[in-house]
């Protein structure tokens, strides 16, 4: 066995090598002590020299080795033990020939003093060799025999070194943990494992075993470069020490030790949890609050030092400086998905689209800000027939709309679109971001029922959300009713049955449509297929089945004429709401007009809550099973109302009773059905009962009054003369009219009467109606979710005759606009059919002065437009709406093919001018093709700008 010396490259005089040490052996050695010389003599006697002549130096190398005691003046060196493999072949196999190298840092570990240099020289005083980290593969018998003889001679002579060395083996005092292994790769090749910066003061086996993670992590001097050489955990501890020198404690300690023979993984801890709103940031990156922009330490750092402990242990816990966010807030996979989807358009799955739609709804529900200048483009397409290009899908670039508009509603309009790359055509619904609801996509995304219009994807482009869906060439069921007047019983049952199939499919997935009506049922090109669409009012029900209230302070679902009583009363709602609405749709198909409108005017919400269900509007010619099915679906209490599946079975049996579907797809026009006089008199008598409280009112007076008033609510019949001429006008004294003088409502203008010969009645009948409404509202106040002041506010809004829409006004919107009449058109740039206008107006009425998603008296801008025939349109629109958009929205109410808007004094206005918050007063002007007076116009519903 020989001991060789290898110089350290980092120390001075590093050129010392083995060849330089050998000649030094020829020099005269100092006299040895008594014990040392005796050992030398014993070895010389027992073994004869092997080499002679100039190679005698090798005898000393083999027998004594070359290890020397280091001196302060000599060069710094690391001594290693080398031993021959066999006697014949003098090969040296060093026990440790590699320096400590830390992977990833490209640096050798540097010790601070020579005392930390590992020295594996055996301690002669202990009479045994230090444990070897590497064992040779071959052990010859001669080696074992020589080792045995050497140990015996040492024990017999009691040899000891002149200068005692440390009693602890150098492997144990080494600052670098040495891993014992039976494999030849047992050299301590460290992979970013925690390193000590100073040697342990009292080395022992317990420190080798790493019983406590973080033991010895006490840096004497702050060294900012340590993060390159140690693990991230120690780096965090080091940074903490630099900023908090007064806290000398280490990071929290683990509760379970681990064996020293297995070095710990750099991160055997809990998963790192990022901070909102940057889910994909790195662990040591932007840990800062969004609002304060201050460094935000991670509150989960205490968990980094806990291997299995569920609670943070004592130590330098880092408290968050932003208390607005929860300390234990965790990110879900959905949030990471949304972060990856934002800012691009891609083809994906339905769940990706719904996750992204939530961010759109949240952005639109914030306080209204100026429209973004940049046209952001992001979304998910669910079909391969719509292909994004370079992660974009923009209008007029990748797809284009056709000139003809398929339909429009209170929140948007529907066009036919075509993909420029594939040529695929479908329908696109354009919705403003401010009124977009995520439920519109969450409810229908991924549905596969043939009774639900398939969704092809949605893309947000600036302030607009474009929803792509299947194109059904047959139009809507509401358009068919307008074209046909009213539908035959068999065809109405046929479409109702298909709509109930779609509702049954939705209800099985706990989805409430919320706005079932004829306008939201689309038909195929041959009229044989019907499917539900427009999930703008859809609600996802809770799995417990308890339902939820749909009526809130700033949102009213559905259409007023199809609204269920529990919705009006603000009670808990479930899937039975859609059943009520479907039966109201059935009455619309059979009668050609919406329910309730033939008997009542004004705020129908109070009538729906107080009056019996509209079963009297069932045509007498209907089959018994048809009438029974409608009655079962119009039960006022939801618990007594049938489900969609049960009603579907009744409708199918009723269709079989009438002989199945036999009527043609598009037959002859039929006049809408009007209620018989006795039913009208009955309803109006109930409505006029408070007049009997007057002592001057004779007994038959209410009957006469209702006789004269009933035809007023009926659409005019051309073959017959006006009904009011058949009855004498109603005269009321001033005292009698003064008795019904509600102070909050006295300034309201009455609706114009049809009979010009009764001027007094023109003023007294609306007062009577308002008085009756006020009494009913007070009686129902316990069931209404409104305070007394809010009820008076509702009455003051509802009393405006904007809601008095007769059936003939539905057919001709221009007739509905009378002098000084406020249409309350709302939604997206006044896009509203008459049915939708009723729904949106009801939505505004119950807004109660709070910020709403639709413009109202309280949060919209006022726009007054004088039509070509002198009528005034009073419109409430969104803030920052443009004049051109308003003109496009009212194009159906202007009796001209092409028109433009100017100020009251005739000055032109730009089509892109935003309406100021104070409002604007405009008037219509003709814009024919041959005129050069207009710079822009609206022709056939399309905005044109003169180049």
From Swiss-Prot:
Its main location: cytoplasm. Residues 401-653 are annotated as: Interaction with ZFP91. Residues 741-752 have a biased composition (Low complexity). One of its GO terms (biological process) is immune response. Changing residue 514 to K: In a lung neuroendocrine carcinoma sample; somatic mutation; requires 2 nucleotide substitutions. It catalyses: L-seryl-[protein] + ATP = O-phospho-L-seryl-[protein] + ADP + H(+); L-threonyl-[protein] + ATP = O-phospho-L-threonyl-[protein] + ADP + H(+). ATP binds at residues 406-414, 429. Autophosphorylated. Phosphorylation at Thr-559 is required to activate its kinase activity and 'Lys-63'-linked polyubiquitination. Phosphorylated by CHUK/IKKA leading to MAP3K14 destabilization. GO terms for cellular component: cytosol; fibrillar center; intracellular membrane-bounded organelle; nucleoplasm. It is found in: Cytoplasm. Residues 135-151 have a biased composition (Basic residues). It comes from the Eukaryota. Weakly expressed in testis, small intestine, spleen, thymus, peripheral blood leukocytes, prostate, ovary and colon. The modification Phosphothreonine is found at residue 559. Residues 400-655 form the Protein kinase domain. Residues 814-829 have a biased composition (Polar residues). Residues 665-674 have a biased composition (Basic and acidic residues). Changing residue 565 to R: In IMD112; likely pathogenic; loss of function in non-canonical NF-kappaB signal transduction; unable to phosphorylate CHUK/IKKA. The active site is at residue 515. It is linked to Immunodeficiency 112: An autosomal recessive, primary immunologic disorder characterized by variable abnormalities affecting lymphoid immunity, including hypogammaglobulinemia, lymphopenia or paradoxical lymphocytosis, and recurrent bacterial, viral, and fungal infections. Interacts with TRAF2, TRAF5, TRAF6, IKKA and NFKB2/P100. Interacts with TRAF3 and PELI3. Interacts with NIBP; the interaction is direct. Interacts with ARRB1 and ARRB2. Interacts with GRB10. Interacts with ZFP91. Interacts with NLRP12; this interaction promotes proteasomal degradation of MAP3K14. Directly interacts with DDX3X. Interacts (via C-terminus and kinase domain) with PPPC3A (via N-terminus) and PPP3CB. Lymphotoxin beta-activated kinase which seems to be exclusively involved in the activation of NF-kappa-B and its transcriptional activity. Phosphorylates CHUK/IKKA, thereby promoting proteolytic processing of NFKB2/P100, which leads to NF-kappa-B activation via the non-canonical pathway. Has an essential role in the non-canonical NF-kappa-B signaling that regulates genes encoding molecules involved in B-cell survival, lymphoid organogenesis, and immune response. Could act in a receptor-selective manner. This is Mitogen-activated protein kinase kinase kinase 14. It comes from Homo sapiens (Human).
